[in-house]
Amino acid sequence: MAQKEIVSNRKALRNYEVIETLEAGIVLTGTEIKSLRDHGGNLGDAYVIVSKGEGWLLNASIAPYRFGNIYNHEERRKRKLLLHRYELRKLEGKIAQKGMTLIPLGMFLSRGYVKVRLGCCRGKKAYDKRRTIIEREKEREVAAAMKRRHH
């Protein structure tokens, strides 16, 4: 079954070097699901913590559902992630390393359920960001040259 990307965290890909990725389920209310289907989510400042054997998504913004009434949800509440115990232990070990953090890279629909794509990341320094930009420009120039050559 195809996965439909709902929300992506482009800021994370710019500011962090992704070492490893994994998928996790997330506990949401009905109005949060409906809002996400309307692309009402933002993962810009979001991060994940592991405490007491549970994974939590913090600072993820899911806009209030526009047709939700008094039962609407809080926009930046703490949301529980659904992970197996061995996955949580593995993540705790990764986060314990210096400079490592867990960042949500995106949210997608899989068989009607919202899943979160998590990345075990290390922060990029300014010179790493510049190097990435230079490499991307070189790749673009090579692709353009190849395209001109074949036409």
From Swiss-Prot:
It is found in: Cytoplasm. Its main location: cytoplasm. GO terms for cellular component: cytosol. Pfam families: SmpB. One of its GO terms (biological process) is trans-translation. The keyword Cytoplasm applies. It comes from the Bacteria. Keywords: Cytoplasm, RNA-binding. GO terms for molecular function: RNA binding. Transmembrane segments: none annotated. HAMAP family: SmpB (MF_00023). NCBIfam families: PRK05422.1 (NF003843), smpB (TIGR00086). PANTHER family: SSRA-BINDING PROTEIN (PTHR30308:SF2), TMRNA-BINDING COMPONENT OF TRANS-TRANSLATION TAGGING COMPLEX (PTHR30308). Belongs to the SmpB family. Required for rescue of stalled ribosomes mediated by trans-translation. Binds to transfer-messenger RNA (tmRNA), required for stable association of tmRNA with ribosomes. tmRNA and SmpB together mimic tRNA shape, replacing the anticodon stem-loop with SmpB. tmRNA is encoded by the ssrA gene; the 2 termini fold to resemble tRNA(Ala) and it encodes a 'tag peptide', a short internal open reading frame. During trans-translation Ala-aminoacylated tmRNA acts like a tRNA, entering the A-site of stalled ribosomes, displacing the stalled mRNA. This is SsrA-binding protein. The lineage of its organism: Bacteria, Pseudomonadati, Chlamydiota, Chlamydiia, Chlamydiales. The gene is smpB.
